[in-house]
Amino acid sequence: KMKLLNEILGTKYPIIQGGMANIATGEFAAACSNAGALGLIGSGGMDADSLRENIRRCRALTDKPFGVNIMLMHPQADEFAKIVVEEGVKLVTTGAGNPGKYMAAWKAAGITVIPVVAAAILAKHLEPLGIDAVIAEGTESGGHVGEMTTMALVPQVVDAVHVPVIAAGGIADGRGLAAALALGACGVQVGTCLLASTECPIHENYKAALLKARDSDTIVTGRIGGTPVRVLKNRMSREYVRQEKAGADKMALERFTLGSLRKAVFDGDTENGSLMAGQAAGLLHEVRPVEEIFAAMVSEAKDCIAGVYKEITL
């Protein structure tokens, strides 16, 4: 029997809340953990003191498991790697790089390490480091993306490694969870569907833009420059793509987008802010508590799997 993610992590549901930069605070991670998933603090957009403070706030608000996401290209990644050990964090997910140089210290501290990958070859490369599981994230996801779709990526990662695989990208309801399990994943990581939650600390304008979004309302910026990011279409993202196609240099584009995520998250500027969101935004129709989102996802997945099982007579 395949072990589900909740058995591996000690959570009620086989679901991880994505560690979204400037969004996944200690409070939000605690709310998701208390609702039965694994809450993650997103260290992107934080400095060392802020990360430490968020870990402590999270711990004060939940007695359930939680973790920290570290983007390895963050200028303070080395410092963050030490802080998670000092603060007794039990789980770390990593993105944008190789966590190899931190593994000895993390493993000595008993930390569960789960990297996010966008290709099977990377998962295979990281497995010998002693990782505990891997998140295979498809291009449907919001924020920084790879090229492969979740449906093509997940089974190839499952075949490439011996550790449990968690699916991410384009999953926003029970149908997505059921599909991920059918592809061989042990659970899912979700982000976009949680932006439309009562507890999510983003501006109400950002939530309203998400609820209005349809299936074709996201765009990937930064493909030419090598830092592809999926966001909702708006004035900023269209202008970015126009400048990029016109040959603007990397520094000019960085200046253009400086602070754009904060504009969206904190100021609610839906035209000049970076509204990071995945293609599943079109599935969001109302703002609900995270507890309701997770419970509905698992209940629907069970019904979905039972229904498919009943229909198939091979």
For each of these PLM feature ranges, what is it?
Residues 1-164:
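Active-site entrance/lid segments in N-terminal catalytic domains of soluble metabolic enzymes
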Residues 152-166, 172-314:
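Conserved active-site-proximal phosphate/metal-binding subdomains
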Residues 23, 171-172:
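Residue-level detector of alpha-helix initiation sites
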